Swiss-Prot record:
PANTHER family: ADENYLOSUCCINATE SYNTHETASE. It catalyses: IMP + L-aspartate + GTP = N(6)-(1,2-dicarboxyethyl)-AMP + GDP + phosphate + 2 H(+). It is found in: Cytoplasm. This is Adenylosuccinate synthetase. It comes from Malacoplasma penetrans (strain HF-2). Binds 1 Mg(2+) ion per subunit. SMART domains: Adenylsucc_synt (SM00788). CDD domains: AdSS. IMP binds at D15, E16, G17, K18, N40, A41, G42, H43, T130, R144, Q224, T239, R303. Its EC number is 6.3.4.4. One of its GO terms (molecular function) is GTP binding. InterPro entries: Adenylosuccin_syn_GTP-bd, Adenylosuccin_syn_Lys_AS, Adenylosuccinate_synth_dom1, Adenylosuccinate_synth_dom2, Adenylosuccinate_synth_dom3, Adenylosuccinate_synthetase, P-loop_NTPase.
């Protein structure tokens, strides 16, 4: 097993607390690499007794020993990047260790407007996008009309590409009564943005391959969660990129297989926006209690998250398709004082138990959960430092998870701070 490479991924619908473990483990690595997604997924990190909320810059930015890389698989909004750089610097955090791929596709303001318009036109069938332009930018990428960071530095090249890109978009904007975009105005704005981000821009493919050849330690930071993966998630209620298998194509680092994959699992389930959610808690008072105690509101959208019981049937599927080798359990402290804790161990439809994860969204929406009920615990666990000192029923809960998934739990998080993390298994 190559211990120099670690991938950290969310194992549910996002918002699992990945950023905490990137921050926690960053001291052991030379490079922290974001390889997919955009500024649609926020991550929260508590550093130096301050809470930071970022959408684009990787969590490793708080450790000056790390080289923090936004690789080519990311779609980049330069406005967000500059806002976060300013935000970090104003709080005493250096961004001298930040590197941005010149191959990143750029999110323009017309992508954001297209995102909003398409969602509006769907009416009651809207997916619940964050309206950050992610989908339209990825659409341009696969349609071969996308504009990359390297295109921002030559005004004439940039203008020509924007003119080509807006030919069809402006027709659609006009058709649906929206404002059309002036290519020259857009080119001028984004050329200037390009000059501002230029100090961070580098050929990250060469940078990462050089690091790999020198046996530097590299941590890959995933965004969103596997059940939002465009191929393996609850399509179409998913993000626009692959959460799992994009490391090689999203970084340019030809790795046959990363053997060490840390899956971050929330002790219960949450989901933002529309889409099937089999283990959703129907008792609104209990869902409200967990939502408030766990501060379950979107980092980017501020929308209240839907609350559900831990879905082990779903997680078994996630482990199968992702190759997760170890687990970090987060927000276990939120479940303190919940007397009876349900875990979903299977799905049934028409009273028939399923032995597979349905691909059809229509079938999934008709599924009912099969629950096992476990005893809860009343103790406050937020100050406990040793696994042995955790309440017996909490340890039984974790053992149940391990036995069901056949994957070891390595970390147990009992609070948001870095020091509120128990190492169960070295």
């Amino acid at each position: 097993m190559n211990e120099n490479l670690l991938m950290i991924i969310g194992s549910q619908f996002g918002d699992e607390g990945k950023g905490k473990f990137v921050d926690l483990l960053s001291n052991q690595f030379d490079y922290i690499v974001r390889y997919q997604g955009g500024d649609n997924a926020g991550h929260t990190i508590v550093f130096d007794n301050k809470t930071f909320k970022l959408r684009l810059i990787p969590s490793g930015i708080f450790n000056p020993r790390n080289r923090v890389v936004i690789a080519n698989g990311v779609v980049l909004n330069p406005i967000t990047l500059l806002e976060e750089v300013k935000y970090l610097k104003s709080n005493g955090v250096s961004t001298d260790n930040l590197y941005v791929s010149d191959k990143c596709h750029v999110i323009f303001n017309f992508h954001i407007e297209m995102d909003k318009m398409l969602e509006e036109l769907k009416g009651s069938k809207k997916i619940g996008t964050t309206n950050k332009g992610i989908g339209p930018c990825y659409t341009d990428k696969v349609s071969r009309v996308g504009i990359r960071v390297c295109d921002l530095f030559d005004f004439n090249v940039l203008l020509a590409k924007i003119q080509d890109n807006l030919q069809i978009k402006n027709v659609l904007f006009s058709r649906y009564g929206k404002q059309i975009f002036n290519p020259y105005t857009i080119a001028k704005q984004y050329y200037e943005l390009g000059q501002q981000i230029k100090p961070f821009v580098i050929n990250t493919v060469a940078l990462l391959n050089y690091a790999y050849e020198r046996n530097n330690k590299i941590l890959f930071e995933g965004a969103q969660g596997i059940m939002l993966d465009i191929d393996y998630g609850t399509y179409p209620y998913v993000t626009s990129s692959n959460v799992i298998g994009l490391v090689s194509s999203g970084t340019g680092l030809a790795i046959n297989k990363i053997k060490r994959i840390l899956g971050v699992v929330k002790a219960y389930s949450t989901r933002v926006g529309s889409g099937p959610f089999v283990s959703e808690i129907e008792e609104e008072n209990l869902a409200h209690y967990i939502r408030e105690k766990g501060h379950e509101y979107g980092t980017v959208t501020k929308r209240p998250r839907r609350i559900g019981w831990l879905d082990l049937f779903l997680l078994k599927y996630v482990v199968t398709v992702s190759g997760i080798s170890e687990i970090a359990i987060t927000l276990i402290d939120v479940l303190s004082k919940v007397q009876k804790i349900k875990v979903c161990i299977g799905y049934k439809r028409n009273d028939k138990q399923l032995n597979y994860m349905p691909s059809s969204i229509e079938e999934l929406q008709k599924c009912e959960p099969i629950y096992e009920i476990l005893d809860g615990w009343s103790e406050d666990v937020s100050r406990i430092k040793s696994y042995d000192d955790l309440p017996l029923n909490l340890k039984r809960y974790i053992s149940y998870i391990e036995n069901f998934l056949k994957v070891r739990v390595r970390f147990v998080s009992v609070g948001p701070d870095r020091n509120q993390t128990i190492i169960k298994d070295n």
